[in-house]
Amino acid sequence: MKTLVMKFGGSSVGTTSALIQVLSIVLNEREQWDRLVLVVSALDGVTDMLIEAAGLANMGNQRGYRRIVANLRTRHLAMIEELPLGNSERGALQADIDRLLFDMLDIYQGMTHSSDRWAATQKLDASIGVGEKLAARIIAALLRQNDVRSVAIDTTNLIVTDDSHGNAIPNIAMSRTQIATNVLPLLERGIVPVITGFIGATRSGQPTTLGRGGSDLTASILGAGVGAQEIWLWTDVDGLMTADPREVDTARVIPHLSYEEAAELAYFGARILHTRMLAPIQSEHIPVWIKNVFKPQKPGSNISPGSGRSELTIKAVTSIAGVALTADHSGSLSTISALVDQTLYENTRSHADVMISSQSSTRSFLCVLIPTAAGPDAIHNTHIALEKKLSEQAADGVWRVNTVSIITAISDSFDHRPQLVAQVLNALRNLPILGLAQGPSNCSFSVVVNSHYADEALIRIHELILNPH
């Protein structure tokens, strides 16, 4: 039985016209595949609104969070009024929306009266996954209205995780058992499940979230669990790009990447792909396609084993924020590394990844990558918190904190074509480089520069992609 898992991101389900396009895609692919599984994100912008509402609840601002919930209700009800739904489906959806939002108001009320930080983190996860639940119910209703047997399923019953709220780690084996029990029987009956991305639950049933972009990870776990032949990630761009088009206007679509290249691309800042998405499917050799929901005829980008080394060139270049710490002394870096990790976790619920550490007899340097999943304010908040903590720990010596950019060239040819490294360094001549690192996968080569040199470094390396010879 040919099985396809399709994930629709927030930009793919953000408007009525986008949902009609999703319906068209599903109806078309239903004719080509024996079994379909859909994974959906919240409507575009909804998760950010829910995070804002939770913050207001923590501050006791009842009027503020109630206003946001009212706006969410208005938006979702307006959408289902515009969709081609019968009265029965529309009425049931309205009841579902109200029930979910009333439950969320109860969570916010509990946050207002709690000073327990751990409990607040648990409640945050319980509340911000509501957007996915709303979207899943709307899409399932739209499919049923068009004679597709469909049901919305919450992944709190499927994806089993640890209790790292905000960036939970799935237990793949336990999740696959849940998928076999709850999803496979539906597929055998010809039902199309519409499954919430981003969310999971601990073994005790406490809701968790998988970090920003976590719906990709949901799709890969489901793909492995149902034995999918392919996974398609639908978004609002034509595929993975050679660079972020917001930073490099000559960026173009990458037709094909290996698993290793795509994983490095995600790790070093590509926002289209979750950093942990590929791990559950590599051993299964399931190919992934990234496609534009508004231009479904375009081929998109393919991720699969082996990338065609005959190209022997750089595939992409990325930029991601980091924090660099320097000191005019030598000594153990373990204490300062632990302090950075603790500070980042306190501010973002993400752990620090030490990118580069180096020492001479008189100088120490440490560069820490701030993952995109930590959110847009992570770099600023971490910088300020680190400066404060370091000023209180003079015994460890005087450390200076700077915001930096980590510019990374991606290619699986670095291991057998070392001249690529020379080409990158030659392209960056006259730019001050703070540090260098080649990834253990041999698919990445990174340079650390002060943030105001990031754009220039990106453009220079991207020229090597456009003109490889």
Segments (PLM) and residue ranges:
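Nucleotide/pyrophosphate-binding catalytic subdomain
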Residues: 1-273, 278, 448-450, 469
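Short phosphate-binding/catalytic loops that engage adenosine nucleotides
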Residues: 34, 148, 286, 352, ...
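Acidic carboxylate-rich catalytic motifs and surrounding loops in phosphoryl-/glycosyl-chemistry enzymes
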Residues: 156, 291-294
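Positions that flank functional sites
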Residues: 158-159, 238-240, 296, 362, ...
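Short hydrophobic alpha-helical runs that function as membrane-insertion/retention elements
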Residues: 230-234, 288-290, 355
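Acidic/polar loop patches that form or flank catalytic/metal-binding clefts of enzymes
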Residues: 274, 285-292
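A conserved regulatory-domain signal marking ACT and ACT-like small-molecule sensing domains
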Residues: 299-469
